[in-house]
Curated annotation (Swiss-Prot):
GTP binds at residues 226-231, 245-251, 270-273, 335-338. It comes from Pseudomonas putida (strain W619). K(+) binds at N226, T245, I247, T250. Mg(2+) binds at S230, T251. (6S)-5-formyl-5,6,7,8-tetrahydrofolate binds at R24, E81, K120, K456. This is tRNA modification GTPase MnmE. Its EC number is 3.6.-.-. InterPro entries: G_TrmE, GTP-bd, GTP-bd_TrmE_N, GTPase_MnmE, MnmE_dom2, MnmE_helical, P-loop_NTPase, Small_GTP-bd. GO terms for molecular function: GTP binding; GTPase activity; metal ion binding. The keyword Ligase does not apply.
Length: 456
């Protein structure tokens, strides 16, 4: 049986008790179900107040029935909403009544899946519904809404159209080699290609910010032993999450703490102090610390501002720079300002990193600077007119597209291989298509929609 032609039903409101609860139906039986349950023919897009009845004609509840005939509905099919009282027993009775008239219970995300299959939403917009529901901050909610309204999809479609235009130009040059002008070598292809790469880079950067807002930023606290890393973690967490002693090497393993700053999710990782050691257990901790540094979205490199080596903290541990070469992802924390007498403050350094001077022992001003800085790193200060939500799979697809464009450019400039460039352009277009669902496997769609709420 084609499950898309079945009529599905589910409770669309959150679990628990509330003033109003909604049962939603979608499919060819929606109009008939509305007639059987309400005892009247429902006028499209009108609110009908009255009783909801069972098979015997007994009243289950009283509420409002709304009928939306397809294709002018959320799913593109006939849709019925029964809005009654929000008690779980009442809603379950109403849902069972829908099953009696021929509906089946909907799978998680099946309403959004049908909207996608009926071209009412693309895949990025469908995912934005779940992101909007799960948003943990006002900025994340605004970004998700912009993705739902199609902002992210428009950017991807624009890139796709530019790739298609470039593919047409390149493949025409390949198909007509007898032309006197070598169109692949006239500079126009490289100009078009570099323009697409520049726009793709911009979308990548903005998508990365959107993913941080949605998934949270991983912040690794690193530094020498006794620099105050664990004290800083405790201040950010607002509790004694880590043991703090004067003994060097107290922290020997990774310690993770999930916190929120004004609704912004952060995954904070405290690490073992970076130093050479003969202690086998501590050495493993240092190795794990370096691995965490390489995987972090942001690194807080904590130094003791009273120590002599604080004048050149990046020279303390060469392996640190090997794992984190981009200074723009590093925030230098000059800790123990209460002992060194250094003024609390924030400085943007010439090489791209930020330095914050503070005391991890209750320095409210310095900790406020750090919190605001971390929020800014996550895109908290974006305006409502910029930004969109994105997921890790979107970032992977954008990276794949970028890699294909880089490879194709190299094939053209080094070998003059137009055919290989054309193939890389096709692969880049395919990668972008995975974002909106233009090219997506059934397995991928199943994984995405199964993570949605039932009734969405």
């Amino acid at each position: 049986m084609n499950t898309v032609r079945e009529t599905i039903a589910a409770i669309a409101t959150a679990q628990g008790r509330g003033g109003v609860g909604i049962v939603r139906l979608s499919g060819p039986l929606a109009a008939k179900a509305g007639q059987l349950i309400t005892g009247r023919t429902l006028t499209p897009r009108h609110a009908h107040y009255g009783p909801f009845r069972d098979q015997e004609g007994l009243v289950l509840d009283e509420g409002i029935a709304l009928f939306f005939p397809g294709p002018n509905s959320f799913t593109g099919e006939d849709v019925l909403e029964l809005q009654g009282h929000g008690g779980p027993v009442v809603l379950d009775m109403l849902l069972q009544r829908c099953v009696q008239v021929g509906c089946r219970l909907a799978r998680p995300g099946e309403f959004s899946e049908r909207a996608f299959l009926n071209d009412k939403l693309d895949l990025a917009q469908a995912e934005a519904i779940a992101d909007l529901i799960e948003a943990s901050s006002s900025q994340a909610a605004r970004n998700a809404l912009r993705s739902l309204q199609g902002e992210f999809s428009k950017r991807v479609h624009s890139l796709t159209e530019a790739l298609i235009a470039l593919r047409i130009y390149v493949e025409a040059a390949i198909d007509f080699p007898e032309e006197e002008i070598d169109f692949l070598a006239d500079g126009h292809v490289l100009s078009m290609l570099d323009s697409v790469r520049a726009e793709l880079s911009t979308v990548q950067r903005e998508a990365g910010q959107g993913a941080l807002l949605r998934d949270g930023m991983t912040v690794v606290i690193a530094g020498r032993p006794n620099a105050g890393k664990s004290s800083l973690l405790n201040q950010l967490a607002g509790r004694e999450a880590a043991i703090v002693t004067a003994i060097a090497g107290t922290t020997r393993d990774i310690l993770r703490e999930h916190i929120h700053i004004d609704g912004m999710p952060l995954h904070v990782v405290d690490t073992a102090g970076l130093r050479d050691t003969d202690d086998h257990v501590e050495k493993i901790g240092v190795e794990r610390a370096l691995k965490a540094i390489g995987e972090a979205d942001r690194v807080l490199l904590v130094v003791d501002s009273t120590a002599p080596e604080a004048s050149d903290p990046f020279a303390l541990w060469p392996e640190f720079l090997d794992q984190r070469p981009d200074p723009g992802k590093v925030t230098l924390i000059r800790n123990k300002a209460d002992l060194s007498g250094e003024p609390v403050g924030l400085e943007q350094c010439d090489d791209g990193h930020v330095t914050i001077t503070l005391s991890a022992k209750g320095d409210d001003q310095g900790l406020l600077l750090l919190r605001d800085h971390l929020k800014a790193c996550m895109g908290y200060e974006q305006t409502a007119e910029s930004g969109f939500s994105a997921r890790r799979r979107h970032l992977d697809a954008l990276r794949q597209a970028c890699a294909h464009l880089e490879h194709g450019r190299a094939q053209l400039t080094l070998a003059g291989a137009g055919e290989l460039l054309a193939e890389d352009l096709r692969q880049a277009q395919h990668a972008l298509g995975e974002i909106t669902g233009a090219f997506s496997s059934d397995d991928l769609l199943g994984r995405i929609f199964s993570s949605f709420c039932i009734g969405k």
